[in-house]
Amino acid sequence: MNENVIALDGPAGSGKSTVARQIAERIGFNYLDTGAFYRALTLYLFRLHGNSPNTESFADWVKTSEAERSLSDIRILCEFSAGKENRIFLNGEEVSLAIRTPEITREIKHIAKRRIYRNFVNQELHSLAKLHKLIIDGRDIGTEVFPDAKFKFYLTASSKVRAERRFLQLQEQGIEADRDEIEKEIILRDKSDMEREIAPLYQANDAILIDTDILSKNSVISKILKILDR
């Protein structure tokens, strides 16, 4: 059993990152957003595709040997900050905001469903878990990445509630967005995450389900802290 990792899984916008950050701060763990690693990887490949003299779509290009070989050139670093989002660096460049744009959100599904890219990210996560006590949020932390985590939680919420949360988050970052479009993208993302062949999104048998539609943020945090104190 891995006591260095607390796993929080669930669909996009279910409140995982907000809850995970605050719990990490209270119990002395580091919060790690796995989605940021996939976003940074997507950003790198998206830029590389844009500079490549090819006519393939991004979805097709990421399947090529050219794209896969580029993994050896990627360095993703995470700077922990108590109570705040991780600062993410891609080959020395801070990309904490660049990885959160709607454009990257739309393209990330092409990366997340390919085993070679998942293996790349998972190796990074396991390396960090050897050095730090982590509370990690993602889609498959308790089912695929750390199935031996001592504590596993699965957070969920309706697509409408999740879209509103994402809209407000983008507003705070100065990024223009449309609520309806965000909800459409969330629904499509859910479908893609749940139906993909590799590491689909689902609740682990031993994970505790928490519906954040009907609980306030503080209630969710209190509930998880009580379970961790058992």
Curated annotation (Swiss-Prot):
Q: What is its EC number?
A: 2.7.4.25
Q: Transmembrane stretches, by residue range? A: none
Q: In which compartments does the protein localize?
A: Cytoplasm
GO biological process per UniProt: nucleobase-containing small molecule interconversion; pyrimidine nucleotide metabolic process
Any one GO MF annotation of this record:
dCMP kinase activity
- The residues that hold ATP are G10, P11, A12, G13, S14, G15, K16, S17, T18
Record's catalysed reaction(s): CMP + ATP = CDP + ADP; dCMP + ATP = dCDP + ADP
What GO CC annotations are associated with the protein? cytosol
The answer to whether the entry has keyword Transit peptide is no
Name the family the entry cites: Belongs to the cytidylate kinase family. Type 1 subfamily.
Q: What is this protein called?
A: Cytidylate kinase
Classification lineage: Bacteria, Pseudomonadati, Spirochaetota, Spirochaetia, Leptospirales
